[in-house]
Amino acid sequence: MSTGAATDCRDRQVSAADAVSVVRPGDKVFVGSACATPRTLVDALEQLWLSGVVLVHFLTDRVGKGDPPHTNYRHRVFYVGRDVRALHDVRAVREAGLVEYVPISLGDVPQLFHNGQVPLDVAMVQVAPPDPDGTCSLGISVDVTKAATLAARAVIAEVNPAMPRTAGDSRIPVDRIASFVPVETPVVEYLHDPAGEVAEQIARYVARLIDDRSTLQVGLGRVPNEMLAHLTNRRELAIHSDVITEPVVDLVAAGVVTGPVATSWAMGSKRLYDLVDDDPRFAFHPVEYICDPTVIGSKERMVSVTQAFTIDLTGQVCTESLDGALYGGVSTGPAFHRGALASLDGMAIVCLASRTPAGRSAIRLDLGPDEPVAIARADVHWVITEYGTAYLFGRSVAERAVALIEIAHPEVRSELLDAAIERGLVGPRQQLRSRTAYPVAEVRDVRLRDGRELRLRPTRTSDTRAMQDLFYRLSEEDRETRFLHKLSSLTDSAAQHLCSVDYEEEMAFAAVVGPAAHERIVGASFYYLSPATGLAEVAYMIDPDWQGLGLGGILHAELVAYAREHGAHGLTADVLLGNTRMMRVFERGDHSLSVKTEGGVEELTMLF
Protein backbone atom coordinates (compact mmCIF):
# COMPACT_ATOMS: atom_id res chain seq x y z
CA MET A 1 0.00 0.00 0.00
CA SER A 2 1.35 3.44 -0.87
CA THR A 3 1.97 5.93 1.94
CA GLY A 4 -0.76 8.20 0.59
CA ALA A 5 -3.37 5.47 0.35
CA ALA A 6 -2.49 4.14 3.80
CA THR A 7 -2.68 7.61 5.30
CA ASP A 8 -6.04 8.31 3.64
CA CYS A 9 -7.39 5.04 5.00
CA ARG A 10 -6.15 5.70 8.54
CA ASP A 11 -7.39 9.28 8.51
CA ARG A 12 -10.87 8.08 7.65
CA GLN A 13 -11.04 5.16 10.08
CA VAL A 14 -14.03 5.43 12.39
CA SER A 15 -16.24 3.17 14.46
CA ALA A 16 -19.24 1.49 12.88
CA ALA A 17 -21.55 3.74 14.90
CA ASP A 18 -19.80 6.85 13.59
CA ALA A 19 -19.79 5.52 10.03
CA VAL A 20 -23.57 4.96 9.89
CA SER A 21 -24.18 8.44 11.30
CA VAL A 22 -24.11 9.69 7.69
CA VAL A 23 -27.47 7.95 7.14
CA ARG A 24 -30.34 10.41 7.39
CA PRO A 25 -34.09 9.85 7.74
CA GLY A 26 -35.59 8.92 4.38
CA ASP A 27 -32.28 7.71 2.90
CA LYS A 28 -31.97 4.81 0.49
CA VAL A 29 -29.09 2.66 1.78
CA PHE A 30 -27.46 -0.03 -0.35
CA VAL A 31 -26.18 -3.11 1.50
CA GLY A 32 -23.27 -5.10 0.02
CA SER A 33 -23.92 -8.57 -1.28
CA ALA A 34 -23.58 -12.25 -0.44
CA CYS A 35 -20.54 -13.33 1.58
CA ALA A 36 -19.26 -9.73 1.57
CA THR A 37 -22.31 -8.38 3.39
CA PRO A 38 -20.96 -5.72 5.82
CA ARG A 39 -22.41 -7.29 8.96
CA THR A 40 -20.85 -4.80 11.38
CA LEU A 41 -22.34 -1.84 9.53
CA VAL A 42 -25.74 -3.52 9.18
CA ASP A 43 -25.82 -4.23 12.92
CA ALA A 44 -24.81 -0.65 13.74
CA LEU A 45 -27.54 0.76 11.51
CA GLU A 46 -30.15 -1.50 13.12
CA GLN A 47 -29.23 0.05 16.48
CA LEU A 48 -30.64 3.33 15.19
CA TRP A 49 -34.23 4.20 14.48
CA LEU A 50 -34.36 6.48 11.47
CA SER A 51 -37.75 7.05 9.91
CA GLY A 52 -38.23 6.38 6.23
CA VAL A 53 -34.91 4.60 5.67
CA VAL A 54 -35.02 1.89 3.00
CA LEU A 55 -32.34 -0.81 2.69
CA VAL A 56 -31.70 -1.77 -0.93
CA HIS A 57 -29.97 -5.08 -1.61
CA PHE A 58 -29.54 -8.13 -3.76
CA LEU A 59 -28.46 -11.39 -2.09
CA THR A 60 -27.35 -10.71 1.48
CA ASP A 61 -25.84 -12.89 4.16
CA ARG A 62 -27.70 -11.33 7.07
CA VAL A 63 -30.22 -8.53 7.40
CA GLY A 64 -32.34 -7.97 10.47
CA LYS A 65 -31.38 -9.06 13.96
CA GLY A 66 -32.54 -11.42 16.67
CA ASP A 67 -34.38 -14.73 16.59
CA PRO A 68 -36.94 -14.49 15.14
CA PRO A 69 -35.34 -11.72 13.12
CA HIS A 70 -36.73 -8.21 13.11
CA THR A 71 -35.76 -4.98 11.43
CA ASN A 72 -36.27 -1.28 11.95
CA TYR A 73 -36.36 -0.56 8.23
CA ARG A 74 -38.10 -1.30 4.99
CA HIS A 75 -36.20 -3.61 2.61
CA ARG A 76 -36.35 -3.24 -1.16
CA VAL A 77 -34.81 -6.43 -2.53
CA PHE A 78 -33.90 -7.85 -5.93
CA TYR A 79 -33.66 -11.40 -4.62
CA VAL A 80 -35.48 -13.23 -1.84
CA GLY A 81 -32.72 -15.19 -0.14
CA ARG A 82 -32.70 -17.14 3.08
CA ASP A 83 -32.34 -14.14 5.39
CA VAL A 84 -35.03 -12.13 3.60
CA ARG A 85 -37.39 -15.12 3.68
CA ALA A 86 -36.79 -15.40 7.42
CA LEU A 87 -37.75 -11.74 7.81
CA HIS A 88 -40.78 -12.11 5.57
CA ASP A 89 -41.95 -15.13 7.56
CA VAL A 90 -42.30 -12.96 10.68
CA ARG A 91 -45.96 -11.96 10.71
CA ALA A 92 -45.37 -8.43 12.03
CA VAL A 93 -42.76 -7.76 9.34
CA ARG A 94 -44.98 -9.14 6.60
CA GLU A 95 -48.09 -7.27 7.72
CA ALA A 96 -46.14 -4.02 7.95
CA GLY A 97 -45.00 -4.50 4.36
CA LEU A 98 -41.36 -4.12 5.33
CA VAL A 99 -40.09 -6.45 2.58
CA GLU A 100 -40.69 -5.43 -1.04
CA TYR A 101 -39.46 -7.63 -3.88
CA VAL A 102 -38.54 -6.05 -7.24
CA PRO A 103 -38.79 -8.57 -10.10
CA ILE A 104 -35.94 -7.55 -12.41
CA SER A 105 -33.03 -9.13 -14.22
CA LEU A 106 -29.98 -8.52 -12.07
CA GLY A 107 -28.04 -7.14 -15.02
CA ASP A 108 -30.54 -4.28 -15.26
CA VAL A 109 -30.22 -3.19 -11.62
CA PRO A 110 -27.15 -0.95 -12.14
CA GLN A 111 -29.17 1.06 -14.65
CA LEU A 112 -31.68 1.85 -11.87
CA PHE A 113 -28.85 3.20 -9.74
CA HIS A 114 -27.21 5.25 -12.48
CA ASN A 115 -30.36 6.87 -13.89
CA GLY A 116 -31.74 7.72 -10.46
CA GLN A 117 -34.84 5.54 -10.64
CA VAL A 118 -33.54 3.92 -7.45
CA PRO A 119 -31.52 6.79 -5.93
CA LEU A 120 -28.87 5.69 -3.45
CA ASP A 121 -27.83 7.99 -0.65
CA VAL A 122 -25.43 5.64 1.12
CA ALA A 123 -23.70 2.42 0.09
CA MET A 124 -22.44 0.09 2.85
CA VAL A 125 -19.86 -2.38 1.52
CA GLN A 126 -16.87 -4.51 2.49
CA VAL A 127 -13.48 -4.09 0.78
CA ALA A 128 -9.91 -5.34 0.88
CA PRO A 129 -7.28 -2.89 2.20
CA PRO A 130 -6.32 -0.10 -0.25
CA ASP A 131 -3.63 -0.79 -2.85
CA PRO A 132 -0.75 1.43 -4.01
CA ASP A 133 -2.73 2.59 -7.03
CA GLY A 134 -5.26 4.29 -4.75
CA THR A 135 -8.04 1.74 -5.24
CA CYS A 136 -9.75 -0.89 -3.13
CA SER A 137 -10.88 -4.28 -4.38
CA LEU A 138 -14.48 -5.25 -3.70
CA GLY A 139 -13.13 -8.76 -3.38
CA ILE A 140 -15.53 -11.63 -3.84
CA SER A 141 -18.67 -9.53 -4.46
CA VAL A 142 -18.58 -7.11 -7.38
CA ASP A 143 -22.09 -7.93 -8.69
CA VAL A 144 -24.32 -4.82 -8.36
CA THR A 145 -22.09 -3.49 -5.59
CA LYS A 146 -19.68 -1.61 -7.84
CA ALA A 147 -22.52 0.25 -9.54
CA ALA A 148 -23.92 1.14 -6.11
CA THR A 149 -20.60 2.56 -4.89
CA LEU A 150 -20.30 4.73 -7.99
CA ALA A 151 -23.88 6.03 -7.74
CA ALA A 152 -24.30 6.63 -4.00
CA ARG A 153 -23.87 10.03 -2.35
CA ALA A 154 -21.64 8.47 0.33
CA VAL A 155 -19.83 5.14 0.61
CA ILE A 156 -18.91 3.61 3.96
CA ALA A 157 -16.82 0.46 3.98
CA GLU A 158 -15.67 -2.26 6.28
CA VAL A 159 -11.98 -2.76 5.43
CA ASN A 160 -11.02 -6.37 6.03
CA PRO A 161 -7.52 -7.81 5.52
CA ALA A 162 -9.12 -11.25 5.04
CA MET A 163 -11.01 -10.06 1.94
CA PRO A 164 -9.28 -11.35 -1.23
CA ARG A 165 -8.01 -8.86 -3.77
CA THR A 166 -9.59 -10.05 -7.00
CA ALA A 167 -8.60 -9.43 -10.59
CA GLY A 168 -10.84 -8.06 -13.31
CA ASP A 169 -12.99 -4.96 -12.84
CA SER A 170 -13.41 -5.22 -9.08
CA ARG A 171 -11.87 -1.94 -7.89
CA ILE A 172 -13.24 1.39 -6.72
CA PRO A 173 -11.24 4.55 -5.93
CA VAL A 174 -10.29 5.07 -2.30
CA ASP A 175 -11.54 8.63 -2.78
CA ARG A 176 -15.09 7.29 -3.16
CA ILE A 177 -15.08 5.95 0.40
CA ALA A 178 -16.10 8.48 3.07
CA SER A 179 -15.10 6.34 6.03
CA PHE A 180 -13.43 3.01 6.76
CA VAL A 181 -14.44 0.68 9.59
CA PRO A 182 -11.62 -1.77 10.37
CA VAL A 183 -12.78 -5.37 10.84
CA GLU A 184 -10.66 -8.47 11.24
CA THR A 185 -13.11 -11.31 10.82
CA PRO A 186 -12.97 -14.27 8.44
CA VAL A 187 -14.87 -13.71 5.23
CA VAL A 188 -18.31 -15.30 5.54
CA GLU A 189 -18.35 -18.84 4.18
CA TYR A 190 -21.28 -20.46 2.44
CA LEU A 191 -21.49 -24.10 1.41
CA HIS A 192 -24.60 -25.63 -0.10
CA ASP A 193 -26.34 -28.24 2.00
CA PRO A 194 -25.50 -31.78 0.81
CA ALA A 195 -27.49 -32.66 -2.28
CA GLY A 196 -30.27 -35.15 -1.69
CA GLU A 197 -31.04 -38.06 -3.96
CA VAL A 198 -33.31 -35.98 -6.20
CA ALA A 199 -30.82 -33.16 -6.75
CA GLU A 200 -28.03 -35.69 -7.26
CA GLN A 201 -29.93 -37.47 -10.04
CA ILE A 202 -30.87 -34.22 -11.77
CA ALA A 203 -27.24 -33.11 -11.61
CA ARG A 204 -26.14 -36.35 -13.29
CA TYR A 205 -28.59 -35.80 -16.15
CA VAL A 206 -27.41 -32.22 -16.59
CA ALA A 207 -23.75 -33.23 -16.61
CA ARG A 208 -24.38 -35.81 -19.36
CA LEU A 209 -25.28 -32.99 -21.76
CA ILE A 210 -22.05 -31.03 -21.23
CA ASP A 211 -19.21 -31.60 -23.69
CA ASP A 212 -15.51 -30.87 -23.49
CA ARG A 213 -14.47 -27.26 -24.16
CA SER A 214 -17.80 -25.89 -22.96
CA THR A 215 -18.17 -22.62 -21.05
CA LEU A 216 -20.33 -23.00 -17.96
CA GLN A 217 -22.67 -20.86 -15.96
CA VAL A 218 -22.84 -22.25 -12.45
CA GLY A 219 -25.74 -20.21 -11.07
CA LEU A 220 -27.41 -20.25 -7.69
CA GLY A 221 -29.14 -23.42 -6.61
CA ARG A 222 -28.20 -26.84 -5.35
CA VAL A 223 -28.46 -28.64 -8.70
CA PRO A 224 -26.14 -26.36 -10.71
CA ASN A 225 -23.67 -26.52 -7.84
CA GLU A 226 -23.86 -30.32 -7.61
CA MET A 227 -23.51 -30.64 -11.39
CA LEU A 228 -19.89 -29.53 -11.12
CA ALA A 229 -18.99 -32.65 -9.14
CA HIS A 230 -20.00 -34.80 -12.13
CA LEU A 231 -17.69 -33.09 -14.64
CA THR A 232 -14.38 -34.55 -13.50
CA ASN A 233 -13.90 -36.45 -16.77
CA ARG A 234 -14.39 -33.38 -18.98
CA ARG A 235 -11.55 -31.36 -20.44
CA GLU A 236 -10.76 -27.73 -21.22
CA LEU A 237 -13.82 -26.21 -19.58
CA ALA A 238 -14.14 -22.47 -19.02
CA ILE A 239 -16.52 -20.55 -16.76
CA HIS A 240 -18.55 -17.43 -17.45
CA SER A 241 -20.97 -17.28 -14.56
CA ASP A 242 -22.79 -14.93 -12.24
CA VAL A 243 -21.35 -16.84 -9.28
CA ILE A 244 -18.66 -19.42 -8.64
CA THR A 245 -18.92 -21.90 -5.78
CA GLU A 246 -16.77 -24.38 -3.87
CA PRO A 247 -16.62 -27.24 -6.45
CA VAL A 248 -14.78 -24.91 -8.84
CA VAL A 249 -11.71 -25.36 -6.63
CA ASP A 250 -11.63 -29.10 -7.32
CA LEU A 251 -12.21 -28.70 -11.07
CA VAL A 252 -9.34 -26.24 -11.34
CA ALA A 253 -7.07 -28.49 -9.27
CA ALA A 254 -7.95 -31.50 -11.44
CA GLY A 255 -7.16 -29.65 -14.66
CA VAL A 256 -10.78 -29.83 -15.83
CA VAL A 257 -11.25 -26.05 -15.85
CA THR A 258 -8.31 -24.72 -17.83
CA GLY A 259 -9.95 -21.80 -19.59
CA PRO A 260 -10.70 -18.35 -18.21
CA VAL A 261 -13.03 -17.93 -15.25
CA ALA A 262 -15.16 -14.77 -15.39
CA THR A 263 -17.67 -14.16 -12.62
CA SER A 264 -19.37 -11.47 -10.57
CA TRP A 265 -19.27 -12.93 -7.08
CA ALA A 266 -18.08 -16.01 -5.19
CA MET A 267 -19.66 -18.06 -2.41
CA GLY A 268 -17.69 -20.83 -0.76
CA SER A 269 -15.07 -21.49 1.88
CA LYS A 270 -11.61 -20.14 2.55
CA ARG A 271 -10.31 -22.65 -0.03
CA LEU A 272 -12.17 -20.81 -2.77
CA TYR A 273 -11.28 -17.37 -1.44
CA ASP A 274 -7.58 -18.26 -1.25
CA LEU A 275 -7.73 -19.55 -4.82
CA VAL A 276 -9.14 -16.33 -6.28
CA ASP A 277 -6.94 -14.03 -4.19
CA ASP A 278 -4.72 -12.02 -6.53
CA ASP A 279 -4.99 -14.72 -9.23
CA PRO A 280 -5.39 -13.32 -12.77
CA ARG A 281 -7.11 -16.53 -13.93
CA PHE A 282 -10.21 -15.38 -12.03
CA ALA A 283 -11.71 -12.13 -13.29
CA PHE A 284 -14.49 -10.50 -11.24
CA HIS A 285 -16.68 -8.09 -13.21
CA PRO A 286 -19.84 -6.05 -12.57
CA VAL A 287 -23.00 -8.01 -13.12
CA GLU A 288 -24.12 -5.83 -16.05
CA TYR A 289 -21.13 -7.18 -18.01
CA ILE A 290 -21.24 -10.78 -16.82
CA CYS A 291 -25.00 -11.04 -17.45
CA ASP A 292 -25.07 -9.21 -20.78
CA PRO A 293 -26.69 -11.70 -23.21
CA THR A 294 -24.47 -10.37 -26.02
CA VAL A 295 -21.33 -11.12 -24.01
CA ILE A 296 -22.68 -14.51 -22.97
CA GLY A 297 -23.64 -15.35 -26.54
CA SER A 298 -20.10 -14.62 -27.74
CA LYS A 299 -18.82 -17.64 -25.79
CA GLU A 300 -18.67 -20.83 -27.84
CA ARG A 301 -20.54 -23.84 -26.40
CA MET A 302 -22.03 -21.74 -23.61
CA VAL A 303 -24.12 -23.81 -21.17
CA SER A 304 -26.61 -22.12 -18.85
CA VAL A 305 -28.33 -24.04 -16.06
CA THR A 306 -31.42 -22.43 -14.52
CA GLN A 307 -32.98 -23.99 -11.45
CA ALA A 308 -36.75 -23.57 -11.68
CA PHE A 309 -39.59 -24.39 -9.32
CA THR A 310 -42.55 -25.08 -11.61
CA ILE A 311 -43.36 -25.47 -15.31
CA ASP A 312 -46.66 -25.85 -17.13
CA LEU A 313 -47.36 -28.44 -19.82
CA THR A 314 -46.64 -25.98 -22.62
CA GLY A 315 -43.21 -25.09 -21.22
CA GLN A 316 -43.71 -21.82 -19.30
CA VAL A 317 -41.16 -21.67 -16.48
CA CYS A 318 -41.46 -20.10 -13.02
CA THR A 319 -38.32 -19.35 -10.97
CA GLU A 320 -39.65 -16.86 -8.40
CA SER A 321 -42.28 -18.64 -6.31
CA LEU A 322 -42.22 -21.91 -4.41
CA ASP A 323 -45.32 -23.37 -2.77
CA GLY A 324 -47.03 -19.98 -2.75
CA ALA A 325 -44.15 -18.01 -1.25
CA LEU A 326 -41.60 -15.66 -2.78
CA TYR A 327 -38.37 -17.56 -3.27
CA GLY A 328 -35.27 -16.47 -5.15
CA GLY A 329 -36.09 -14.12 -7.97
CA VAL A 330 -35.55 -13.34 -11.63
CA SER A 331 -31.84 -12.93 -10.81
CA THR A 332 -29.59 -13.82 -13.76
CA GLY A 333 -31.38 -16.88 -15.12
CA PRO A 334 -33.28 -15.41 -18.09
CA ALA A 335 -30.24 -13.39 -19.26
CA PHE A 336 -27.96 -16.42 -19.22
CA HIS A 337 -30.69 -18.51 -20.84
CA ARG A 338 -30.99 -16.05 -23.75
CA GLY A 339 -27.23 -15.72 -24.05
CA ALA A 340 -26.68 -19.48 -24.18
CA LEU A 341 -29.28 -19.80 -26.94
CA ALA A 342 -27.34 -17.22 -28.98
CA SER A 343 -24.03 -19.03 -28.43
CA LEU A 344 -22.51 -21.20 -31.15
CA ASP A 345 -23.35 -24.77 -30.09
CA GLY A 346 -24.71 -23.35 -26.83
CA MET A 347 -27.23 -25.04 -24.59
CA ALA A 348 -29.86 -23.61 -22.22
CA ILE A 349 -31.04 -26.05 -19.56
CA VAL A 350 -33.92 -25.71 -17.10
CA CYS A 351 -33.87 -28.14 -14.18
CA LEU A 352 -36.35 -28.74 -11.38
CA ALA A 353 -37.45 -31.43 -8.95
CA SER A 354 -40.61 -33.24 -10.04
CA ARG A 355 -42.25 -32.30 -6.74
CA THR A 356 -42.11 -29.17 -4.61
CA PRO A 357 -41.23 -29.40 -0.89
CA ALA A 358 -44.96 -29.37 -0.13
CA GLY A 359 -45.44 -32.50 -2.24
CA ARG A 360 -47.19 -30.87 -5.21
CA SER A 361 -46.26 -31.72 -8.77
CA ALA A 362 -43.84 -29.16 -10.17
CA ILE A 363 -45.07 -30.00 -13.69
CA ARG A 364 -48.61 -28.65 -13.97
CA LEU A 365 -51.42 -28.14 -16.41
CA ASP A 366 -51.28 -24.42 -15.58
CA LEU A 367 -49.05 -22.20 -13.52
CA GLY A 368 -50.85 -20.63 -10.59
CA PRO A 369 -51.63 -16.91 -10.23
CA ASP A 370 -48.71 -16.63 -7.80
CA GLU A 371 -46.27 -18.33 -10.22
CA PRO A 372 -45.01 -15.71 -12.69
CA VAL A 373 -43.39 -16.76 -15.95
CA ALA A 374 -39.64 -16.09 -15.96
CA ILE A 375 -38.79 -17.95 -19.18
CA ALA A 376 -41.30 -17.98 -22.03
CA ARG A 377 -42.20 -21.34 -23.53
CA ALA A 378 -40.83 -20.38 -26.95
CA ASP A 379 -37.36 -20.05 -25.39
CA VAL A 380 -37.34 -23.32 -23.47
CA HIS A 381 -35.13 -26.07 -24.91
CA TRP A 382 -33.96 -28.63 -22.33
CA VAL A 383 -35.98 -29.49 -19.22
CA ILE A 384 -34.63 -31.99 -16.69
CA THR A 385 -36.11 -33.61 -13.59
CA GLU A 386 -34.91 -36.60 -11.59
CA TYR A 387 -37.05 -38.73 -13.92
CA GLY A 388 -35.36 -37.79 -17.17
CA THR A 389 -34.80 -35.23 -19.88
CA ALA A 390 -37.23 -33.51 -22.25
CA TYR A 391 -36.36 -31.40 -25.29
CA LEU A 392 -39.10 -28.89 -26.16
CA PHE A 393 -37.74 -26.48 -28.75
CA GLY A 394 -39.50 -26.75 -32.10
CA ARG A 395 -42.03 -29.21 -30.69
CA SER A 396 -45.79 -28.84 -30.94
CA VAL A 397 -47.92 -28.16 -27.88
CA ALA A 398 -48.96 -31.83 -27.84
CA GLU A 399 -45.38 -33.06 -28.14
CA ARG A 400 -44.28 -30.72 -25.35
CA ALA A 401 -47.03 -31.93 -23.05
CA VAL A 402 -46.16 -35.59 -23.62
CA ALA A 403 -42.43 -34.99 -23.14
CA LEU A 404 -43.02 -33.13 -19.86
CA ILE A 405 -45.51 -35.68 -18.51
CA GLU A 406 -42.89 -38.37 -19.13
CA ILE A 407 -40.49 -36.67 -16.69
CA ALA A 408 -43.14 -35.81 -14.09
CA HIS A 409 -43.44 -37.83 -10.90
CA PRO A 410 -44.91 -41.26 -11.78
CA GLU A 411 -47.79 -40.82 -9.33
CA VAL A 412 -49.18 -37.82 -11.22
CA ARG A 413 -48.55 -38.83 -14.85
CA SER A 414 -51.99 -40.34 -15.41
CA GLU A 415 -53.66 -37.33 -13.83
CA LEU A 416 -51.61 -34.94 -15.96
CA LEU A 417 -52.35 -36.90 -19.12
CA ASP A 418 -56.10 -36.89 -18.38
CA ALA A 419 -55.98 -33.14 -17.74
CA ALA A 420 -54.03 -32.55 -20.95
CA ILE A 421 -56.58 -34.57 -22.93
CA GLU A 422 -59.47 -32.70 -21.28
CA ARG A 423 -57.83 -29.36 -22.11
CA GLY A 424 -57.19 -30.45 -25.69
CA LEU A 425 -53.42 -30.20 -25.44
CA VAL A 426 -53.06 -33.80 -26.66
CA GLY A 427 -55.31 -36.13 -28.57
CA PRO A 428 -57.85 -38.40 -26.86
CA ARG A 429 -55.93 -41.55 -27.85
CA GLN A 430 -52.60 -40.47 -26.41
CA GLN A 431 -50.88 -43.30 -24.53
CA LEU A 432 -48.31 -43.10 -21.76
CA ARG A 433 -47.30 -46.34 -20.09
CA SER A 434 -44.08 -45.38 -18.31
CA ARG A 435 -44.46 -45.38 -14.53
CA THR A 436 -40.79 -45.18 -13.52
CA ALA A 437 -37.72 -43.04 -14.07
CA TYR A 438 -36.12 -43.13 -17.48
CA PRO A 439 -33.58 -46.02 -17.37
CA VAL A 440 -30.50 -43.92 -18.09
CA ALA A 441 -28.26 -46.81 -17.03
CA GLU A 442 -29.27 -48.56 -20.26
CA VAL A 443 -27.87 -45.77 -22.46
CA ARG A 444 -24.59 -46.59 -24.20
CA ASP A 445 -22.53 -45.62 -27.23
CA VAL A 446 -21.64 -48.31 -29.78
CA ARG A 447 -19.44 -48.55 -32.87
CA LEU A 448 -20.52 -50.32 -36.07
CA ARG A 449 -18.38 -52.32 -38.49
CA ASP A 450 -17.73 -49.31 -40.71
CA GLY A 451 -16.48 -47.26 -37.75
CA ARG A 452 -19.56 -45.08 -37.39
CA GLU A 453 -20.79 -44.46 -33.85
CA LEU A 454 -24.32 -44.18 -32.56
CA ARG A 455 -26.14 -44.17 -29.27
CA LEU A 456 -28.36 -46.95 -28.02
CA ARG A 457 -31.03 -45.83 -25.56
CA PRO A 458 -34.48 -46.80 -24.31
CA THR A 459 -37.30 -45.18 -26.25
CA ARG A 460 -39.61 -42.48 -24.93
CA THR A 461 -43.23 -41.79 -25.79
CA SER A 462 -41.98 -38.56 -27.36
CA ASP A 463 -40.06 -40.65 -29.94
CA THR A 464 -43.33 -41.34 -31.76
CA ARG A 465 -42.66 -39.00 -34.71
CA ALA A 466 -39.06 -40.17 -35.12
CA MET A 467 -40.24 -43.81 -35.09
CA GLN A 468 -42.77 -43.03 -37.81
CA ASP A 469 -40.00 -41.40 -39.83
CA LEU A 470 -37.97 -44.62 -39.54
CA PHE A 471 -40.95 -46.66 -40.69
CA TYR A 472 -41.43 -44.56 -43.82
CA ARG A 473 -37.74 -44.94 -44.73
CA LEU A 474 -38.14 -48.73 -44.79
CA SER A 475 -38.65 -50.47 -48.11
CA GLU A 476 -41.90 -52.34 -48.73
CA GLU A 477 -40.00 -55.59 -48.26
CA ASP A 478 -38.57 -54.43 -44.93
CA ARG A 479 -42.01 -53.39 -43.70
CA GLU A 480 -43.45 -56.77 -44.60
CA THR A 481 -40.50 -58.49 -42.91
CA ARG A 482 -41.05 -56.53 -39.71
CA PHE A 483 -44.87 -56.59 -39.55
CA LEU A 484 -45.43 -59.90 -41.41
CA HIS A 485 -47.80 -58.31 -43.90
CA LYS A 486 -47.83 -55.41 -46.32
CA LEU A 487 -48.24 -52.19 -44.35
CA SER A 488 -48.33 -48.75 -45.97
CA SER A 489 -48.64 -46.55 -42.87
CA LEU A 490 -47.82 -46.44 -39.18
CA THR A 491 -50.58 -44.66 -37.28
CA ASP A 492 -49.97 -42.47 -34.25
CA SER A 493 -51.48 -45.16 -32.03
CA ALA A 494 -49.28 -47.86 -33.53
CA ALA A 495 -46.16 -45.72 -33.18
CA GLN A 496 -47.06 -44.91 -29.57
CA HIS A 497 -47.45 -48.62 -28.90
CA LEU A 498 -43.87 -49.14 -30.10
CA CYS A 499 -42.36 -46.21 -28.19
CA SER A 500 -44.42 -45.93 -25.02
CA VAL A 501 -43.24 -48.77 -22.77
CA ASP A 502 -43.25 -49.33 -19.03
CA TYR A 503 -39.52 -50.22 -18.83
CA GLU A 504 -40.46 -53.35 -16.91
CA GLU A 505 -42.50 -55.92 -18.84
CA GLU A 506 -42.16 -53.78 -21.96
CA MET A 507 -38.93 -52.37 -23.33
CA ALA A 508 -37.76 -50.78 -26.56
CA PHE A 509 -34.36 -49.52 -27.63
CA ALA A 510 -33.66 -46.86 -30.25
CA ALA A 511 -30.36 -46.57 -32.10
CA VAL A 512 -29.95 -42.83 -32.66
CA VAL A 513 -27.54 -40.54 -34.46
CA GLY A 514 -27.15 -36.77 -34.53
CA PRO A 515 -27.26 -34.13 -31.80
CA ALA A 516 -29.29 -34.98 -28.71
CA ALA A 517 -31.64 -32.09 -29.46
CA HIS A 518 -32.80 -33.64 -32.75
CA GLU A 519 -31.79 -37.27 -32.92
CA ARG A 520 -32.66 -39.53 -35.85
CA ILE A 521 -33.68 -43.11 -35.12
CA VAL A 522 -31.88 -45.51 -37.47
CA GLY A 523 -32.78 -48.74 -35.73
CA ALA A 524 -35.08 -50.04 -33.02
CA SER A 525 -35.80 -53.18 -31.04
CA PHE A 526 -38.96 -54.05 -29.13
CA TYR A 527 -39.58 -56.37 -26.16
CA TYR A 528 -42.91 -57.48 -24.68
CA LEU A 529 -42.80 -59.95 -21.78
CA SER A 530 -45.56 -62.47 -21.11
CA PRO A 531 -45.80 -62.93 -17.33
CA ALA A 532 -47.53 -66.27 -17.90
CA THR A 533 -44.65 -67.86 -19.83
CA GLY A 534 -41.70 -65.72 -18.78
CA LEU A 535 -40.88 -65.29 -22.47
CA ALA A 536 -40.56 -61.94 -24.22
CA GLU A 537 -41.65 -61.37 -27.80
CA VAL A 538 -39.10 -59.29 -29.72
CA ALA A 539 -38.96 -57.48 -33.06
CA TYR A 540 -36.57 -55.15 -34.91
CA MET A 541 -36.50 -52.32 -37.47
CA ILE A 542 -33.32 -51.13 -39.22
CA ASP A 543 -32.96 -48.13 -41.55
CA PRO A 544 -31.96 -49.38 -45.03
CA ASP A 545 -28.87 -47.13 -44.98
CA TRP A 546 -27.72 -48.77 -41.75
CA GLN A 547 -28.29 -52.43 -42.62
CA GLY A 548 -25.45 -54.92 -43.01
CA LEU A 549 -23.28 -53.15 -40.43
CA GLY A 550 -24.04 -55.31 -37.41
CA LEU A 551 -26.69 -53.01 -35.94
CA GLY A 552 -29.29 -55.78 -35.79
CA GLY A 553 -26.90 -57.98 -33.83
CA ILE A 554 -26.13 -55.13 -31.42
CA LEU A 555 -29.83 -54.43 -30.80
CA HIS A 556 -30.49 -58.14 -30.31
CA ALA A 557 -27.60 -58.54 -27.87
CA GLU A 558 -28.92 -55.57 -25.90
CA LEU A 559 -32.36 -57.16 -25.60
CA VAL A 560 -30.86 -60.51 -24.58
CA ALA A 561 -28.83 -58.82 -21.84
CA TYR A 562 -31.87 -56.84 -20.68
CA ALA A 563 -34.07 -59.95 -20.64
CA ARG A 564 -31.57 -61.96 -18.60
CA GLU A 565 -31.05 -59.12 -16.16
CA HIS A 566 -34.80 -58.84 -15.59
CA GLY A 567 -35.42 -62.55 -15.10
CA ALA A 568 -36.99 -63.50 -18.44
CA HIS A 569 -36.68 -67.17 -19.41
CA GLY A 570 -36.12 -66.44 -23.07
CA LEU A 571 -37.24 -64.65 -26.22
CA THR A 572 -39.68 -65.40 -29.01
CA ALA A 573 -39.99 -63.91 -32.48
CA ASP A 574 -41.93 -64.45 -35.69
CA VAL A 575 -39.70 -64.27 -38.77
CA LEU A 576 -40.80 -64.53 -42.38
CA LEU A 577 -39.51 -67.67 -44.07
CA GLY A 578 -36.35 -66.78 -45.96
CA ASN A 579 -35.26 -63.93 -43.68
CA THR A 580 -31.80 -65.45 -43.31
CA ARG A 581 -30.24 -62.28 -41.93
CA MET A 582 -32.49 -62.26 -38.87
CA MET A 583 -32.13 -66.01 -38.45
CA ARG A 584 -28.35 -65.58 -38.21
CA VAL A 585 -28.84 -62.97 -35.49
CA PHE A 586 -30.92 -65.39 -33.40
CA GLU A 587 -28.53 -68.29 -33.91
CA ARG A 588 -25.68 -66.43 -32.23
CA GLY A 589 -25.08 -66.74 -28.50
CA ASP A 590 -25.18 -69.20 -25.63
CA HIS A 591 -28.78 -70.41 -25.67
CA SER A 592 -31.05 -73.07 -27.13
CA LEU A 593 -33.06 -72.19 -30.24
CA SER A 594 -36.14 -74.01 -31.50
CA VAL A 595 -37.90 -73.23 -34.78
CA LYS A 596 -41.47 -74.00 -35.78
CA THR A 597 -42.63 -73.19 -39.31
CA GLU A 598 -46.26 -72.42 -40.03
CA GLY A 599 -47.87 -70.55 -42.92
CA GLY A 600 -44.64 -69.05 -44.25
CA VAL A 601 -43.61 -67.80 -40.82
CA GLU A 602 -40.87 -69.24 -38.64
CA GLU A 603 -41.75 -69.09 -34.96
CA LEU A 604 -38.48 -68.83 -33.02
CA THR A 605 -38.09 -69.62 -29.33
CA MET A 606 -34.78 -68.91 -27.65
CA LEU A 607 -34.34 -70.19 -24.09
CA PHE A 608 -31.57 -68.98 -21.77
Sequence positions of predicted segments:
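Long, contiguous binding/interaction regions
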Residues: 437-608
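Intrinsic disorder at enzyme termini
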Residues: 426-442
